[in-house]
């Protein structure tokens, strides 16, 4: 699924990416390899900003990222990722690794014109739809259905309510 999501993001060297849901840090590391490949000039590097709502997961992901040598290309913070990460917005790409009830407006607002977001959307039951959200250079939003998926629910202000 990580590969499918990364391919759909159409990542390029130099992109600034917001990842909502850090998990172990694995997905952020794979994105960093594409947008900030070692061996390329640092001035061309992009950066991944990850927001994880569960403190223990965020701390583990940060430790994994640093130990794997990605600390200069990935920043992990603990907070409500459903609201995005306004400090570093706007983003070329946004990837959400938990299913939202709808596409959160703050994430769309923090996406650059010409940007792409990949997000699972649907109920908390086992199946959702992977959506590719594209913000045109005119600011208009287009969505493409990428198929059925099963993700944990997105929590936070713009996530599922329990």
What name fits each language-model region?
Residues 1-7:
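A glycine-rich, Thr/Ser-enriched phosphate-binding loop motif common to dinucleotide/cofactor-binding enzymes
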Residues 10-138:
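Conserved nucleotide-cofactor-binding alpha/beta core module
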Residues 122-162:
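Active-site capping/gating segments
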């Amino acid at each position: 699924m990580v590969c499918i999501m990364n391919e759909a993001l159409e990542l390029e060297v130099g992109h600034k990416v917001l990842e909502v849901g850090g998990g172990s840090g694995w997905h952020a590391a794979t994105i960093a390899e594409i947008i900030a490949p070692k061996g390329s000039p640092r001035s061309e590097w992009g950066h991944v900003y990850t927001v994880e709502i569960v403190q223990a997961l965020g701390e583990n992901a940060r430790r994994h990222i640093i130990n794997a040598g990605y600390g200069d290309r990935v920043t992990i913070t603990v907070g409500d990722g459903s609201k995005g990460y306004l400090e570093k917005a706007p983003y070329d790409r946004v990837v959400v690794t938990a299913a939202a009830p709808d596409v959160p407006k703050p994430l769309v607002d923090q996406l650059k014109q010409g940007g792409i977001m990949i997000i699972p959307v649907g109920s908390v039951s086992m199946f959702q739809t992977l959506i590719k959200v594209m913000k045109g250079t005119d600011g208009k939003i287009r969505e493409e259905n990428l198929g059925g998926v099963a993700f944990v629910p997105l929590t936070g202000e713009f996530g599922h309510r329990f």
